[in-house]
Amino acid sequence: VKTDRRSALAGLAGSLTCIATGGCSELMASETAPTFIRREGIRLMSGDMPYRIAGANMWYAAWLGADAEYGNRARLGRELDRLKQLGLNNVRIMAAAEEGPLKNSISPGFSKADGSLNPELLGGLDYAIAEIAKRGMTAVVCLGNFWEWSGGFGTWLYRVTGQYMDMNDPAHPWPAYPDATAAFYGNAEAIALYREYVRAIVARTNSLTGQAYADDPAIMSWQLANEPRPGGSDAGVASHQDAYIQWIDDSAELIRSLDAHHLVSLGHEGTQGAHGSEDIIRRAHAKVDYLTAHIWPLNWGWVDGKDLAETWDAGSEKVRDYLATHERLATELNKPLVFEEFGFPRDGEVYSPGTPSTFRERYYRTIYNAVEVSRRSNGPVMGSNFWAWNGEARTAHADARFRQGDLAYMGDPPHEPQGWYGVFDNDDAMLAAIGDHANALAVE
């Protein structure tokens, strides 16, 4: 593994021109795919070597991979080539999106409003996984979402109850949305729809390669959902947490009944997504293979985006404490830990590509340092995935808002300002930080 990654970096160093044309895909198509990633105690392993993740979030990979008006396979190839050039070996992608009435949901989805599956987008997923495999990379494949931007649990509930709630609806202030969405775990009909969809994806055969997903080593992990929470209020969590744990355990069992080769993960934020409860974290990760933590200092009020200089010190201390808490929990549970989402705004909370990102760079290096320190001390942290890769995409609108019909997909989901957290291909300081860390992990 270490030789492959080092030689890939060296071999690609002089090949930047092919990125502009998408021509690197064939160059890397002959790379040997990794063995199935597995868990041994607190380690993720590939063969007899630890598998350390230097990764990115790229939720939109299947959309680019679709042979459809909204797809752009040439761009997908260029973006994956850029990530490979940086030394990254893992991407986290969405394999679920449910069409429905929620105003912030991406369209098209994998599951159409009438419940039928979208063959074009499924083909896009096939293509994305095949392209990831060509580059010797792996994917975390996410099968659902607690949040509304891809439809998610709220849409499954809507399909069986006829009722829904938009996030940030003034008529339903926080935490009404997470409490309402957590009702999913106790609704047998909604869970049945989710399970049916999970079966369709996990048991799928890639239409382009003829390989069953269950037999494809390019898939590192099936992930139950993006950031599933047990609720938002004391009462909501108390009401839903037992059904929540049961849903996790049953879903992990379902996936393993369909696929004996791949890891299963939850996609959890950590204690911030568990109403501060370490006990919920322990229970939630009992039946999955590794822990995840997501770290969002601005969203959680730990820093002020308009005054990062004055709020950085206190905020970064909370970040370090959060990382340490989850490393301790992973050690206690004897399981690996991945910091699979972390994001930070640019200086002044602006959105434009190439603009200063002094504190974002400092933040990324804080996360990366924690990964590297854990490695040196034989700890459980096996890597990270930054949120998120924007690459060559650029917004077409002065207000940086995504509009229906826009096709320049970014790591910033459509309901958020385009450029808020994502890393563009000309963010040189950020690319250097990401590449430095990938290099540090490249030799075992």
Spans of features found by a protein language model:
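C-terminal segment of N-terminal export signals and the immediately downstream linker at the start
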Residues: 23-33
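Exposed alpha-helical structural elements
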Residues: 23, 75, 429-433
